[in-house]
UniProtKB/Swiss-Prot annotation:
Superkingdom of source: Bacteria
Family: Belongs to the SurE nucleotidase family.
Listed name of the protein: 5'-nucleotidase SurE
Organism: Maricaulis maris (strain MCS10)
GO cellular component: cytoplasm
Catalytic activity: a ribonucleoside 5'-phosphate + H2O = a ribonucleoside + phosphate
């Protein structure tokens, strides 16, 4: 359980200047007055769980409780907890609010989810928050949806003791607050990965280059998964964990390969 007036560490992958981080700070300040921010100096979307192993990390302090790090979300949470926040460690890590949904296999690319995952690995309850957009074509991002529902959902989570190896992934739909259908607790879904592709272009000098891009296509996911919930205008809440072992295959492999190593 999370204590009253918890110490909260905020991070993201869109960078210290991102609007979604401002939304997250508004959410956090509805829950506590002990809020700290350690976020990447520059955008780190798609960074996943990468660490900065080949470059020095530089910290810029905007004030006592607001800092940027010239690294990834994982770097930020690691340094925030171990080096930058004095006194007791945070009671809660919040990562987001991401500009765009983090659902299905996207969670493995996501720096937002990675920030929460690093907090979880350091023994701190952690939550990733993302605001879906792009389903209404040219409609603006509905930040007010995350802002309205973020704190009430987190308060409910405060009363839940979830396992130490689990983080909570919250995605808000591309709907105005009054049009949100409901909250659905979901499983991680699976999308058609052919939607992600390399888009070929030619620069003014005739040289080829590429941008990674998503085709504007929707899959047809089953009920009960995060994709379907977001498509249906629901808030998706998904428990994620680090153990990627596939249980059924593990048993099959033990029966086939367990014991004395084969020689032919």
């Amino acid at each position: 359980m999370i204590p009253e007036n918890p110490r909260i560490l905020l991070t993201n992958d869109d960078g210290i200047r991102a609007h979604g981080l401002k939304v997250l700070e508004k959410i956090a300040r509805q829950l506590s007055d002990d809020v700290w921010i350690v976020a990447p100096a520059e955008e780190q979307s798609g960074a996943g769980r990468s660490l900065s192993l080949h470059d020095p990390l530089r910290v810029r302090r905007f004030d006592e409780r607001r800092m940027s790090v010239s690294g990834t979300p994982t770097d930020c949470v690691l340094m925030g907890i171990q080096d930058l926040i004095p006194g007791k460690q945070p009671d809660l890590v919040l990562s987001g609010v991401n500009r765009g949904q983090n659902i299905a296999e996207d969670v493995t690319f996501s720096g937002t989810v990675a920030g929460a995952m690093q907090g979880m690995q350091l023994g701190i309850p952690s939550v990733a928050l993302s605001q879906a957009y792009g389903f209404g074509k040219d409609d603006p991002i509905q930040w007010e949806t995350a802002e309205m529902y973020g704190a009430p959902i987190l308060r409910r989570l405060f009363d839940l003791k979830w396992p130490d190896d689990v983080l909570i992934n919250i995605n808000f739909p591309d709907r105005k607050p009054g049009d949100v259908e409901e909250v659905e607790v979901t499983r991680q879904g699976r999308r058609d990965q052919h939607i992600l592709h390399a888009e070929h272009r030619v620069d003014p000098r005739g040289m080829d280059y590429y941008w990674l891009a998503f085709k504007g296509l929707l899959s047809n996911p089953p009920d009960g998964v995060d994709l379907r919930a977001i498509y249906d205008g629901k808030i998706s809440v998904t428990p994620l964990h680090m153990d990627l072992t596939h249980g059924e295959t593990l048993g099959n492999l033990k029966r086939m390969l367990g014991g004395v190593p084969p020689k032919s």
